[in-house]
Amino acid sequence: VKDKLCSLGFEEFDGPLVETEFWDCDALFMPQFHAARDIHDVYAIKNPTHAKSIEEPFLSNVAAVHRDGGNTGSRGWNYNFDEHFTKHLILRSQGTVLSAHQLAKAKVPGKYFGIARCFRYDKVDATHLSDFYQTEGIVLGEEANLKTLLGFLEMFAVEIAGATDVKYVPGYFPFTEPSVE
């Protein structure tokens, strides 16, 4: 997968296995009280339990967007963002945390990907483990839109997964809009 994505012009990104709640959820505009966080039943780090700090201006900007929308034009989530909670250390629960880090420094236009080892508490059985991998990608450009995304997804399905037929259906994920599967 890595070789194929590189051959398609993507640059690889990666990040630490231990993350803060800030990068894992808050930077992705997932409010600290939201039920969407329940699906990210995380493994907490015992020692140390919290990061010393979160990089600025990221902390201030994200906190403002959660509180009242900041300068984005959004109303935000209208709650008191907890700057202590956001420093809580956890094992990475989703690959999108890598995208959040990358977006903070990415060049436009650009194509980026990461293959992320993730951890979530789950009952271990024949089809579930507590760790898994997610492939994450970002395409940045002035003209990029949903049609661009669907074109890339079709290319991945054919070039990487060997699909002969691709069908899109609307999907619901509480933290993305629009969503397709």
Label the model's feature ranges.
Residues 1-181:
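TRNA-recognition modules of translation machinery and tRNA-sensing kinases, especially anticodon-binding
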